[in-house]
């Protein structure tokens, strides 16, 4: 991706974050939407917007199916968002927006949770071993 497309993608990412937060008032959009990245096609026809959605009532961050409703809302609002985006972009055409669930970020969060659990378990095991060693030294 050349530098111009990268800059345009970054600008779209910033603008969309504000637009989604302030102007999309659909009650079906229950989670906190974060835009991970935007990839603009070389002909400026499309912009693939990768999002993660943190649902407050869901514990499973890896559940892609739980976010399908929010993605439907975003894809339905894509025309409105494109129109609003056209007011701030300095391009002749505004790319069509396609929203996708960013599985890379979700998988990374899931892996961090697993690592944190393993570290906590290791620390507990180490503390238990130290307590057992001190207890056996006291008996001697």
From Swiss-Prot:
Keywords of this entry: Cytoplasm, Ribosome biogenesis
GO cellular component: cytosol
Main location: cytoplasm
Compartment list: Cytoplasm
Keyword Cytoplasm tagged: yes
GO biological process, one term: maturation of SSU-rRNA
InterPro entries per UniProt: KH_dom-like_a/b, RbfA, RbfA_dom_sf
HAMAP family: RbfA (MF_00003)
Subunit structure: Monomer. Binds 30S ribosomal subunits, but not 50S ribosomal subunits or 70S ribosomes.
Protein name as catalogued: Ribosome-binding factor A
